[in-house]
Amino acid sequence: SIPDYAGNNFFNTIGNLIADPRVGLMFVDFQTGGLLQLSGRATVEWAPRDSHDPEALRMINVEIDEVIDRPQAVGLRWERRQNLTRALKVTRRVAESAGITSFYLAPVDHLPLATFVPGQHLPVEVHLPGRAESAKRSYSLSGAAEDKQAYRLSVKRKEKGQVSRYLHDRLRVGDEIVAHRPSGEFLMPPGTDPLVLISAGVGVTPMLSMLHAVANQPARQAWFLHGARNGKEHAFRDEVAHLVKDHQRIGLRVFYSQPDKDDQQGRWDYTTGRVTAQRVLDLNAGATAQYMICGPAAFISEIRRGLQAGGIADERIHFETFGPAAS
């Protein structure tokens, strides 16, 4: 039996099996190089009882027709690494905006933190009340990569997000959380090509880590474009302003879609409206510029299409989507 999980609530694999129940399974033992191949027919158990996995919403049962065992068929050999997780303690909590809170996490064992590349995220495990299994999430590292004392995770509270609600409502200074090594492929491009950082909402978090890195690169030109509903929901406003004020080579553009009365008093510079591809293109960042985009899926799709239509090559457009799976 194979468990199937909710994911994004679309059981695509099950749909395929209903149309054609034939399945092939392959299992690799990377320690010995063994390869086990199974073929058969599958049925879907829509309401599993006494499941071995309480997180599974469906079970796929396979009746095996044929088995092929191929010892040492694979040339690769892997070994399981031990102690892949470590305990981190919350040393600070900072409310960054109306819905985003930063958690500073320092190692309990006082050993050095694993390094990360700006743009990467930190996988964490959280034990929620009433659940036997830990909930796993990944949150972008929003602090400077040079900070060796603590990681900073900046999390948006979502009403339907079990983990984000727990972090905001229950996790306090002194509490511990389990974390894996930083990972992720949404990386700040190396070199000196101009960099355009484009974000909306909580998508600002990986961009902030990149902005810290750019501020320490004296020869790199950059632009930081961010969209928020209003000033109350604009996270890291002071921090970004501080990073760019002494660097004429870093441009800053802020957009509020629904500015309130406090915003209209003029303390902060902003443009009413949203971040659009045309506004990005108007920067004239140059033929070698790299474009980093992070935010809701619709936002990313719109910016990407606009940049492509404006002649920006696909290999210069990099993006990461934030959605319900990250809550």
What are these regions (language model features)?
Residues 189-193, 286-287:
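Short helix-loop-beta connector
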Residues 80-176, 180, 194, 228-231, ...:
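Ferredoxin-reductase
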Residues 222-327:
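Reductase modules of NAD(P)H-dependent flavoproteins
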Residues 141, 204-216:
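Histidine-anchored nucleotide/phosphate-binding helix
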Residues 69-81:
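Intrinsic disorder at enzyme termini
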Residues 2-56, 66:
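Short, structured beta-strand-loop surface elements
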Residues 201-202, 297:
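Alpha-helix N-cap/helix-start capping motif
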